[in-house]
Amino acid sequence: MLLDKLEFIENKYDELSVKISDPSIMQNQNEWRKLCKEHADLEVIVNSYREYKKVVEDLKANKEMLSGESDKEMREMLNEEITDLTNREEQLETEIQILLLPKDPNDDKNVFVEIRGGAGGEEAALFAYNLFRMYTRYAETQRWGVEIMSLNETDLGGFKEVVFMIKGNGAYSKLKYESGVHRVQRVPDTESSGRIHTSTATVAVLPEVDDVEIEVADKDVRIDVFRASGNGGQCVNTTDSAVRITHLPTGLVVSCQDEKSQLKNKEKAMKVLKSRLYEQAERERAQGIAEDRKSQVGTGDRSERIRTYNYPQGRITDHRIGLTLYKLDTFLGGDIDEMINALITADQAEKMKLMGNTQM
């Protein structure tokens, strides 16, 4: 029963409240921080559950009062309160069910975002740049940091490929739904006849992983160094500071040339490689677990066409949830929270459905 689980969580929360106030436990800072985090994680659920119990109690009391009340005005007032309390009870039930969903262990992590121009040549590269700008501006609104890992520009200012890191609490929880193929429909600046072209760009969002989560043996990698290049391939560095790492067992290749130091580029490239290997392992694991129950909201299939950006109509359509927004300019300017929140809600609804009957 869900109520039994909530009672267990509340008791656990009370135990932790006592422990984190214990001076003997506070002396062990690592243990104390761990308990504080566990306490904070449970606090939201416990607060909602305690409010739920109070609402149920008040609802019962008002119904009892109503059954013995003959005064018309008092009955009207009690009926209003019962309606409000019933609505709040339903809201809290949904809220608690969502809070009890299994938490993605990567949700609080920083992310690596990889954007590559796909079908459409130069126009696809320009669209890749548009997406990069959209995500970096969104990161600014969230007060997240952005750090470019590698960049391959075209002569017209588009991006053949860009890999960058977004640092901030909850970055993966919001951006993980962006992985997939993004399609743009617009008239290119170079198109004299005014025909609408369709181009694509691929986005991959990878959680940053700790060294302890993924180990890469020296024998499994080949490291090449070369000179960094800028627009159109011209050399921008006189030393071999750029680094390319090839993971021999999988064939994955990562390049980094953003730093002037070869050592720093190697460290950055290795971070990206570990995140790619982690994502690959997680994807294979998830496919094994959910082979026959594909989730409505994908968070990892790079070949899945997830969204269309239609310039003539000023619209964005997410094909996974069928949501269309008519605010293309502000969306590409970083105003993407409405879409992200809709994807999170759809994902939560799908998970609740898979959990089966969770009535309180």
From Swiss-Prot:
Q: What PROSITE patterns does the entry give?
A: RF_PROK_I
Query: What positions are modified (N5-methylglutamine)?
Result: Q234
Keyword Transmembrane present in the record's keywords: the answer is: no
- Region annotation Disordered: where it falls in the sequence: 285-305
Function of this protein? Peptide chain release factor 1 directs the termination of translation in response to the peptide chain termination codons UAG and UAA.
Q: Which PANTHER family match?
A: LD18447P
Family that this chain belongs to: Belongs to the prokaryotic/mitochondrial release factor family.
Q: What is this protein called?
A: Peptide chain release factor 1
**What organism does the record attribute this protein to?**
Clostridium beijerinckii (strain ATCC 51743 / NCIMB 8052)
